[in-house]
Swiss-Prot record:
The keyword DNA-binding is annotated on this UniProt entry: yes
Taxonomic lineage of the native organism: Bacteria, Pseudomonadati, Pseudomonadota, Gammaproteobacteria, Alteromonadales
Family classification: Belongs to the PriB family.
Gene Ontology BP, a term: DNA replication, synthesis of primer
Key words of the record: DNA replication, DNA-binding, Primosome
Task of the protein: Involved in the restart of stalled replication forks, which reloads the replicative helicase on sites other than the origin of replication; the PriA-PriB pathway is the major replication restart pathway. During primosome assembly it facilitates complex formation between PriA and DnaT on DNA; stabilizes PriA on DNA. Stimulates the DNA unwinding activity of PriA helicase.
GO CC terms: primosome complex
Species per Swiss-Prot/TrEMBL record: Shewanella woodyi (strain ATCC 51908 / MS32)
GO molecular function, one term: single-stranded DNA binding
The protein's assembly and partners: Homodimer. Interacts with PriA and DnaT. Component of the replication restart primosome. Primosome assembly occurs via a 'hand-off' mechanism. PriA binds to replication forks, subsequently PriB then DnaT bind; DnaT then displaces ssDNA to generate the helicase loading substrate.
DNA-binding is among the record's keywords: yes
Cited InterPro entries: NA-bd_OB-fold (IPR012340), Primosome_PriB/ssb (IPR000424), Prisomal_replication_PriB (IPR023646)
Protein name according to UniProt: Replication restart protein PriB
Amino acid sequence: MATNHLVLSGTITRSRSFHSPSGIAHSVIMLEHKSQCYEAEMLRNVYCQMQVILSGERFESVTDKLKIGVDIEVQGFIALQQSRNGQNRLVLHAENVELKT
């Protein structure tokens, strides 16, 4: 079996919550990550934005705390998602979320 596990920390820049027609609670946030990492013995600035999806009852207790400007760490798996306009992007499906502030 292939491995698919990602840990990413950052600041929430957008957040929305909704329930699917089947009644499942979902939160969709945009996570902005900034860090510095070494690559080929050179310090490199790293920046990315990634959409994070939190689904199910286990996240209902934290959903109200997921506001713009809050720092979090997310663990989960990545998957390809196609938007309504046909563009593909990677999204992070959360399995664990930890508030950092």
